[in-house]
Amino acid sequence: MELTTEAPFINNNNNNNNNNNNNNNNNNNNNNNNNNNNNNTPNNTSYSNYPQSGYVYQNYPLNNNNGGNNNNTIYYNQPQQYDPNYQTSVTSNSYPQYSYFASPNIISPIPSPCLGSTPSPIPSPTIYQYSNNSNNYCAINTPPLTSVPSPILNCNNKKRPEFNNNNNNHNHNNNNNNNNNNNNYNYNNSNNNQQQQKQQQQQQQQQQQPQQPQQQSQQQQQQQQQQQQQQQQQFKQTNINTTPKNLSPVLQSVNSSASSTPQIQSYFQQPQYQQQYQQQYQQQYQQYQQPQQLSSANTTPQTNERPNYSSIIQPNQLFSQMVPSFINGAINNNNNNNNNNNNNNNNNNNNNNNNNNNNNNNNNTTTNNNNNNNNNNNYNNITYFQPYTPFSIVDNSSMIVPDKQPQQQQPQQQPQQQQQQQQQQQQQQQQQQQQQQQQQQQQQQQQNYNDDSNKNNNNNNNNNNNNNNNNNNNNNNNNENINSSNNNNMYNICPAAAYQNIQFIKEQSNSSLSSSQPIPPFNLYNEQPQQQPQQPQPTQSQPILSSSSTSVFDINHHHHHQQQQQQQQQQQQQQQQQQQQQQQQQQQQQPQPNLSSSSYADNNNSFQSSSGNVWESQSSPIQSSVQISSPPQSNQSSIAPAPAVNLSASASSVATTTKQSNVKKQKQQQQQQQQQQQTKRQELSDSEDDTDNGDDIDEDDEDDDEDEDDMEDEDTSSSSSSSSSSSSLSKKSPAVKKSGLKKSGRSKSSSNESKAKGHWTKEEDEKLRSLVDLHGTKRWKYIASLLCLRNGRQCRERWSNQLDPSIKRDAWTLEEDRIILDAHSKYGNKWAEISKLLPGRTNCAIKNHWNSTMKRKLSKKQYDFSSLPPISSSIVSDNSSSLSTPTDSISSSPSTSPITLSSNVVVNDFDSQQQQQQQQTYQQPPPQSQDSGNNQFNFNNNNNNNNNNNNNNNNSVESIKLYTNVNISYI
């Protein structure tokens, strides 16, 4: 047999509870019973009425078939008693972080940490389970008086029933304050038929008999109270606090099996179980209903302690205050409680209030939406979360679980109620008059805020009515709007974040409870309990709001709008001040010429000649300044009018400023021209060095330098043209000087040395070799971009000084020393020029050799060139190409004419060489771009990539050849 997924005890309980209430109430409540019976079928579409129980359950974990996953848990726990004077402060690590809720007829037999070893009574065996993953629901029927473990059913594809009717039933039970409440908790299957028969008989008797006077009903209530007190004293003497032997131990999670279900079903059918269960529960409930008072009301226990409570919370007395809107039905319960409480307090309005309850029962979906509308109007900070999910919201460590004192049931006094009604009506009239006066004042002061203030006042008027019918009717008119707006946002919010913004209302304490003392709201996060808001004194800007008729949210809403309005006014004032300051600054900065003066035209021309389109940019501010003198518009009434512009007075100042600016511009132009001339001279001198130095600067680098020069010139011209005052020109003059001091390509590359510093690594050397093999030795800038962290100069120097395979690394010879001495006597320390005479030797190597060895030998005269031959072909070629090559002996076509030296060459004497070099005259020929030239004087400079000869011919030489055609004649 399969277990049913519906709650079997709920439909009949509606009749029992309502009939108990009907004993004291008239036939008006019977209409509610009829409507409730029509709605016994569960409504699967609406899920805002669960849980309908007023029980607040403590956290108590239980493993399940998912291996102890806390998301899928059984909803059973220990209820706690409510005490307005007692507060607990328990750390979050004291108890597990779960929150469970059961159906109205569930209380667990498990001893909770708060009760110690004392269990609570078990009115029903039904346990409900939710699944977080799949939005499903199932019910488990377990007999609590047996040791049979309760099976955990698989909740796949099973929907949960709704308990729409239980909400109203429990409301009636709590609010009537009759002694028959003890019998309302007897949820039994066996006696349902008998109870229904008794109910029908009682209803017939009530219809036949006339209504008894109020005094007789008061006497009956007093008798019932005395009987109840006697029963409680008897049960106190007995040891009922001990756990019964036949109660089940801690429920264990066991997988559903076929063997356990027949035992459960068969046990339910036994009449012994039902009778025994009813008797034990009645005894235990009457004993547990009397709470155990604490020694000191205001004491707070330690972190791991809880008060020893052993009583059951009355349904719906504390649920509306302690757990507002755990789900959507929590606030629905509050609204229904208000109506039912008014029925008990105001006997004259029973019929009207009962009609409202009937509407709520027959239209489950509409009542939920109506209540949601109330929440949106009164609880702006309350949010909703997903249904069918375990509620892990309440933190029991910060839960306030005080002990509620038993309320003595007093007879109803009709005169007192009438007096209260009259007082409330008088207060309402006074409030309405004050509100009307305040509305008139607000309309005069704040035109934009009229709509919001009227809405707030209308809401307050509706809340001040004694009959709650007006509120419900207003909400019924807004069902369609709520369905379209709130349903989408209602179920997609995280549960943990839902209670961070909850604010509890205290006004419902008078309506939900029959006692005169209000109960403080439930605190979730161990915060200080909120004090009851004091009635504000009437002022011109704030209406009077009474605590009995208005809510905290209405007051907060009103203050919130006032704060917003003040902020808007402050922002507008700040904006107006900023606009005034900007206008004043524009008037001070912008020169305004005298249109009538003749000097204005001359100045205008000077502007056009020096700075281009400067005058066009200044024409618009003048027009704007002229327009400022006009009176302000209507929408700018608060802004002070700008002062009028006096063009005739400002003409002289404009003329002086324009002359000064023109003089400064002329001076700057002269300085720029001088700087340009200097830079050209430096470039010419550097270009001579660069041409001699070979590929120190690539063609790509030169093109980039020229482009940058053009860009900088444009920037300087635009900066000078855009500046209209002397201050702006003085600020931008240093930039002009920087642009004028343009350095050569060599200095630019040296400035980029900061891009990468440090020694070269092996990886960089290998990468540089591969890039040079691919791209050659002329595109150093491109190679540097591929290499990263190095610039073109660094790459070129690294290649030419270290990585070039043509570099000689052997010892220096006497021939090389003689060539260096001869070249140094002419060129000095121009090592790049000297390196051209020695293929395979770098300028750095020559410089180091000169500084380290050759200077020392020269000072000591240790050189002896006698061992050398008189002259060798290579040396002669070197000397002839570098030292003794006159321009007259060079022809445009290749020839074999001999080369004559103008003086004798004495090899052994170094002084004679210097004299010879002084007598000779050399003229450096201009560079030639043609490939034609004398191949006689070309050297094998492919290794160093220096193709520039003394004639600056770009002829590539592939192999070394002896110059057999060169005839040297000695004079």
UniProtKB/Swiss-Prot annotation:
Region (Disordered) location: 1-54, 151-220, 288-309, 329-383, 440-487, 509-764, 874-898, 911-958
InterPro entries according to UniProt: Homeodomain-like_sf (IPR009057), Mediator/Homeobox_domain (IPR052145), Myb_dom (IPR017930), SANT/Myb (IPR001005)
This protein's GO CC annotations: nucleus
Swiss-Prot/TrEMBL keywords: DNA-binding, Nucleus, Repeat, Transcription, Transcription regulation
GO biological process: mitotic cell cycle; positive regulation of transcription by RNA polymerase II
PROSITE patterns the record matches: HTH_MYB (PS51294)
SMART domains named in the record: SANT
Biased composition range(s): Polar residues: 41-52, 294-309, 591-616
Identification of the protein by name: Myb-like protein AA
